[in-house]
Amino acid sequence: IHSLRRNIDINILLFNNEIYGLTKGQFSPTSKKGIKTKSNPHGTTDEPFSPSDLAIGAQASFFARVVDTDPKLMQRIFIDAEEHRGTSLIEILQNCVIFNDKTFASITAKEVKQNSQLFLEDGKPMLFGEEMNKGIILNGFKLKVVTVGENNIKKEDILIHNAKEEDPTLHAMLARMRPPEFPAALGIIRAVRRPTFDEGIIRQLKYEKENAKFKTVDELLRSGDTWQVKS
C-alpha cells in the first residue's frame, strides 16, 4: 500500500491463485466466499479481498492484469511496467493445480476465453468476443456489455480505453468486471504519470538548500548570539 501511494520506482508482481498453496491449501484473502479448504472445511465466511481495489484505492500509478496461460501478453506488460516511472503492480491470475484447480476457468478456459477476456489497449475501443463485435458502454453510472449491430449500437458507441486518465473511477469499474456478466479486463488498466518518491524527495531537498537561511554548518554556528568560554 505504501509503495503504491508513495510511487516508489519498483515493479511488483502479485501472483493471485486464490489459495495459500505453499502452506498446503489454506484459504487466502482472495479466496472466493464459501470455498472449503483444510483450514476451513465448512467454507470461509470472509468476503474476498480485491487486489485491484487496493491498488487503485492507494492511488497506484500503474496497474495491469494478466493470466498465467498467456506468456506473450505477460512479456509485453512486464516490459511496459519496467519502462513506467513509479510503482507498477501486475496482478497475475495463476492456477494452482493442486489446491485450487480451475479457479479462473471461467476466464481462461479455451472454450470461453474469447468471450470472457477483454484486452485493454490505450486509445482503442473496448471490443472483445469471437467476432470482436461485443463491447463495453456506459449505461448511466454502470458498465454494460453490448453487441455492435444490435439495438442500433455502432462501433463509435463503444468506450475508448484511456489508461492515462487521472480519475480512477472508470479504471476501478473495469478492474472489477468478471464473468459471466462481463469479461475480465486484462492488459494495462491504469498508467498515469506522477512524480516518483525519489523525485519528490530530491526536489524538496533542492528547494530547501536553495532557500535555506544558512548554507553551511559553519554559518549556522556563527549566527545569532555567540560567546566564548575562556579559562
Label every PLM stretch briefly.
Residues 29-81:
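Conserved thiamine diphosphate
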Residues 5-11, 15, 59-60, 84-87, ...:
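Short coil/turn connectors at secondary-structure junctions
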Residues 1-21, 73-76:
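Thiamine diphosphate
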Residues 18-33:
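Glycine-rich anion/phosphate-binding loop at the beta-strand->alpha-helix junction
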Residues 3, 28-32, 81, 106-109:
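Short, hinge-like loop/turn segments at secondary-structure boundaries
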Residues 61-117:
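ATP/pyrophosphate-binding catalytic subdomain of soluble kinases
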Residues 98-231:
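Flexible, low-complexity linker and terminal segments
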Residues 11-16, 91-93, 189-191:
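Short beta-strand segments
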